[in-house]
Regions:
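Aromatic-acidic/polar surface patches that form glycan- and anion
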Residues: 16-18, 89, 183, 187, ...
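Glycine-centered tight beta-turn/hairpin loop motif at sheet-sheet or coil-to-beta transitions
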Residues: 31-35, 203, 224
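Hydrophobic, Leu/Ile/Phe/Ala-enriched alpha-helical segments that form helix-helix packing faces
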Residues: 78-89, 194-205, 246, 250
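Switch/communication elements of ASCE P-loop NTPase nucleotide-binding domains
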Residues: 1-7, 197, 207, 212-285
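Glycine-rich, flexible loop segments associated with nucleotide phosphate handling
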Residues: 21, 49, 179-191, 260-271
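Soluble or luminal CAZymes and related metallo-dependent hydrolases
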Residues: 74-77, 186-193, 238
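P-loop NTPase switch/coupling surface
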Residues: 1-154
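Amphipathic alpha-helical domain-onset/packing element
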Residues: 94, 136-144, 150-213
Length: 285
């Protein structure tokens, strides 16, 4: 929650107990070995250098108005450690920190928006909204962008094969064989990670893709049938969007990884994970 009266993520005024004037949150995270350690100057006297601590405060004044304070020196230091680690290792990713409230639903699928360079910035993986619900709008925008990139790669690959003089002299089966072989060699780690994660969590879901012609729409292959995403039950739609948005965040934080879902790490909080799921789906979560 971003309080306009103070910089940073802080607490709500109503989080303070009725008989108290102040609330405090202590946060401690373990620093991975490959990131480094806090310098001696940034440590408190009895704190291990492999841990990073910071505190959030909210204090009520005499008028009942809360003022916020955050002690984030160690947090700033660990951010610097990650920045230095990424400079020395391009495969180094950032940790996932995400929270999904209990109210999760698909309001609309924004797959019309495109060519937004901000979609792939790692900062978009850390969005934490003050509103008490999630609509997964960022996931659908991201899905459109990565699908467009894959289609552009396939079109370029097809054009290169068409312009290959040696293939022009061969028969059609030879051309199709080369096309299939070249497509297998093409890497699309973001879409591959998405589809693998969805298939793992929802085995009945065979594919999720954007259909461009004759009309732009989101399609699925579910239980052996091709259908519109909107035709799925609310339970399945929400679960696809939730898994997809987690994958989106991991891909943004591990942009150079071929397996972002397997190599990424962090903290993921899902409130009432079985909320709005049907009985059969809730039993296997």
């Amino acid at each position: 929650y971003n309080d306009l009266r103070a910089a940073g993520v802080v607490m709500l005024d109503q989080d303070i107990m009725l008989t108290r004037l102040q609330s405090k949150i202590d946060i401690r995270v373990h620093i991975p070995n490959d990131i480094g350690r806090l310098t001696e100057s940034s440590e408190v006297q009895d704190q291990a250098p492999c841990y990073c601590d910071w505190q959030l405060y909210k204090t009520l004044n005499s008028h009942g108005i809360g003022s916020s304070k955050a002690e984030t020196q160690h947090l700033d230091n660990i951010v610097e450690l990650y920045q230095n680690a990424i400079k020395h290792d391009q495969l180094q990713g950032l940790p996932l920190i995400a929270y999904y409230p209990a109210e999760r639903f698909v309001n609309e699928m924004n797959i019309l928006s495109k060519n937004n360079p901000l979609i792939f910035q790692s900062a978009h993986a850390y969005e934490i909204s003050a509103i008490p619900f999630t609509t997964f709008s960022r996931f659908f925008e991201w899905l459109r962008e990565v699908s467009d990139i894959e289609n552009a790669q396939i079109a370029q690959l097809f054009q290169q094969l068409l312009c290959n003089p040696s293939l022009q002299k061969n028969k059609e089966p030879d051309f199709l064989q080369h096309l299939l072989h070249a497509q297998k060699q093409m890497h699309s780690p973001h879409l591959d990670a998405l589809k693998q994660a969805l298939t793992t969590v929802i085995p009945a879901l065979e594919d999720l893709f954007i259909q461009y012609q004759p009309k732009l729409q989101l399609m699925v292959r579910y239980q052996g049938k091709s259908m519109l995403y909107q035709q799925l039950s609310n339970s399945v739609k929400n679960w696809i969007a939730l898994v997809g948005d987690i994958v989106r965040r991991l891909c943004l934080l591990n942009p150079n990884s071929l397996y972002p879902c397997l190599e990424g790490d962090g903290i993921l909080l899902i409130d009432a994970i079985d909320h709005q799921l049907d009985q059969n789906t809730a039993q296997v979560i």
